[in-house]
């Protein structure tokens, strides 16, 4: 089996990069979301209940309990955590020595601490996915850093036998994510997914589209439907190939997943989610595929024994059979036909919901057994490598580490089976009770989660959008435009990846229902009426662009509109819209309606203030850092960090010694010398044999 040391390093660097984006993006929004004058102050979530420290940390796992000991309030503690997380992630991205389990443990603890107080603004599937992936990175990271100079035939020398084992969990996580995301689209009974028309709405109605989404939206309908078919193929049929014994099948699965994620990044602003999914796909690669050495990538055709030749032929036959079955199944179940007159491909769903439910009931448990068999094989390979370890002390040390990591891997696999089985209730009930108990004991730590993206297509008939309006007299109203979400019909959609403006995202969810389903919206209205600058900066990072920057509005209200992308011929607008209804009534400070809502949602409650000193040096340092960074728009800050990483890596590459090339040349010279010696020896031997035959033949005649 091919080694995966290079993919593991790519995975660890990718996780560090995603942590970097996640921490930095969250840092820019803390004052407006969680500060004392924010929409949902974080201090409301941490109220001491007289419990011991360790019990408190276990039940509510966040380091922010310790913020008062440092003289910080909860929001400042969150500032400190996100800054430290950003610096640690930057270090892990740039330095091999910092890709250590302890560093990834600190990153996971920091993000888990922020998640605990993040409330609705951090309740996204990608936040849970980052926590689960981040925990796996703790296990994948080697205890000793890889050396750049100890590379032997593409595999790092001195590799321990168990180092590939935890990396298998990354592949299992990718399988759960993709398979569940495909299945839930059909189990939801959403008519757009079943009718293959989902993408005719998706580009227009997704939370934060990019400019490319406008162009994608105007593609032909038949191409949209064919794209939905391809999505089902990639998300449902391809994931089992992650565990295929034939590496070319796994590589095909990798490129299919990568293509899907890149297309989503181009057409939608999904922050770090698709980047994180791409990081997970590294588990499908191996050193041979990624190595730059010709000796690993290109092999001379050497004569092989007939069993190997037969095995190669059978593998090729099996590979072609799999591709044929995928093609046949796609054509059959989605009724693909070519209309030669119109030059289009027709498609339709040819199976029923009942048939799909029966199929799902049939295959879900076998996929569990597929994962079990794959893990069992990995364990056998690891045990075989351990047996081959030389030296009793090294074997004993490797055995201890193998026992710990093997137990952790099996335990995490069992834990993950419970959320995975949610896709099919029958399978959920048939799981081993021990797995349920194990999952229940650690569920609050977010070690394993259920996934299912784009379950239903919203916005059919136009995307709903909430538009805030302010007034001084209650008669003349001015729209309050957000930086990122659709508002001004003439403004093009932005490109924000990897930043996630969490208020803009929640505004999209709020528009899908009544305002009472989004209690935080009342908190937003209150802070804007009070003129709180941290919240205003969430709406407009440059306060001068906020229409009420000189004096807060006396009245606020919200209207619900429906938005559509403009037609291709309309050059002056990206959107057109239509008023639907009032979303939030006109209120002012002290208004009985507003006071009732604040009381109903608990937004008037005040927790005890955290003890802190006004002359605290740490607090002053945190305030100074924020003052320096606040003028930068969040996307610019994140892309600036990324640019700095790229620049440093380029400099590192240029200044690094290049022992590989010289060693490669040395090996090449030795090989040539050896081949010359062998050929010279062979010629001498042939001459000697010839002479001996010549001298022996006449004697035989006599």
Swiss-Prot record:
Involved in the maturation of specific proteins in the endoplasmic reticulum. May be required for maturation and transport of active lipoprotein lipase (LPL) through the secretory pathway. Residues 665-681 have a biased composition (Basic and acidic residues). One of its GO terms (cellular component) is endoplasmic reticulum membrane. It comes from the Eukaryota. Residues 660-702 are annotated as: Disordered. Signal peptide: none annotated. Residues 682-693 have a biased composition (Low complexity). The keyword Acetylation does not apply. Belongs to the lipase maturation factor family. Keywords: Endoplasmic reticulum, Glycoprotein, Membrane, Transmembrane, Transmembrane helix. Glycans are attached at residue 488. One of its GO terms (biological process) is protein maturation. Pfam families: LMF1, LMF1_C. It is a multi-pass membrane protein. This is Lipase maturation factor 2. InterPro entries: LMF. Its main location: endoplasmic reticulum. The chain crosses the membrane at residues 10-30, 75-95, 164-184, 226-246, 259-279, 316-336, 363-383, 398-418, 636-656. It is found in: Endoplasmic reticulum membrane.
